UniProtKB/Swiss-Prot annotation:
Protein name listed in UniProt: Platelet-activating factor acetylhydrolase IB subunit alpha2
Modified residues (N-acetylserine): S2
Gene from which this protein is expressed: PAFAH1B2
Cellular localisation: Cytoplasm
One GO cellular component term noted in the UniProt record for this chain: fibrillar center
GO biological process: lipid catabolic process; lipid metabolic process; positive regulation of macroautophagy; spermatogenesis
A Pfam family of this chain: Lipase_GDSL_2
The keyword Oxidoreductase belongs to this UniProt entry's keyword annotation: no
Residues annotated as the enzyme's active site: S48, D193, H196
Keyword Hydrolase set for record: yes
UniProt-recorded Gene Ontology molecular function terms: 1-alkyl-2-acetylglycerophosphocholine esterase activity; platelet-activating factor acetyltransferase activity; protein heterodimerization activity; protein homodimerization activity; protein-containing complex binding
The species this protein was found in: Homo sapiens
Lineage of the species this protein comes from: Eukaryota, Metazoa, Chordata, Craniata, Vertebrata
Length: 229
């Protein structure tokens, strides 16, 4: 799979300020400040699927107690997340687990390029935060009825199932969650706009995610051993 300069989805790039209010950069700068002020055990980074998670009670129930930071920005692609992580959002912190959820907004890229962009994010995290265990959340199906974007996201997930096991400290969490019913439709009770999750939709994702995070946190006893010794 193409990486680096040959893959546009793997080239870090700040989001364009199309609307003219510079909100994207303001959010990034706030995240960089959070890195200086807080000590997260768990870091979430990605697009609106990450960002909106903190608006629901399940975030406060499952993830706030884990000292989690939410670095999600709506509309972000793999390129934007790469840029943010290269420019301060991995500095001054030492999280034990990093959750990555991005790729559904990479409309200009092929499935192969999107998967390569996600792999580039994992490789960057491994370089900057080698102690962290990484969880990549698979891309969700989207659209009320079957459509090409669903097929593309499914292909990204298939590619990641093959490629991520070759990288260190990372695992893919399947987020299918039974969102697509037997008739091929997605319910608005799970995704209110057939893309973004409702509270009930997030519950299907967050409960298994929380279980995996807890498992990984329990598997990082090395620091405790060194402090006890």
């Amino acid at each position: 799979m193409s990486q680096g300069d040959s893959n546009p989805a793997a080239i870090p790039h700040a989001a364009e300020d199309i609307q003219g209010d510079d909100r994207w950069m303001s959010q990034h700068n706030r995240f960089v400040l959070d890195c200086k002020d807080k000590e997260p055990d768990v870091l979430f980074v990605g697009d609106s699927m990450v960002q909106l998670m903190q608006q629901y009670e399940i975030w406060r129930e499952l993830f706030s107690p884990l000292h989690a930071l939410n670095f999600g920005i709506g509309g972000d692609t793999t390129r934007h997340v790469l840029w943010r992580l290269k420019n301060g959002e991995l500095e001054n912190i030492k999280p034990k687990v990093i959750v990555v959820w991005v790729g559904t907004n990479n409309h200009e890229n092929t499935a192969e390029e999107v998967a390569g962009g996600i792999e580039a994010i994992v490789q960057l995290i491994n370089t900057r935060q080698p102690q962290a265990k990484i969880i990549v959340l698979g891309l969700l199906p989207r659209g009320e009825k079957p459509n090409p974007l669903r097929q593309k996201n499914a292909k990204v997930n298939q590619l990641l199932k093959v490629s991520l096991p070759k990288l260190a400290n990372v695992q893919l969490l399947d987020t299918d969650g039974g969102f697509v019913h037997s008739d091929g439709a997605i319910s608005c009770h799970d995704m209110f706009d057939f893309l973004h999750l409702t509270g009930g939709g997030y519950a299907k994702i967050c409960k298994p995610l929380h279980e995996l995070i807890m498992q990984l946190l329990e598997e990082t006893p090395e620091e405790k051993q060194t402090t006890i010794a």
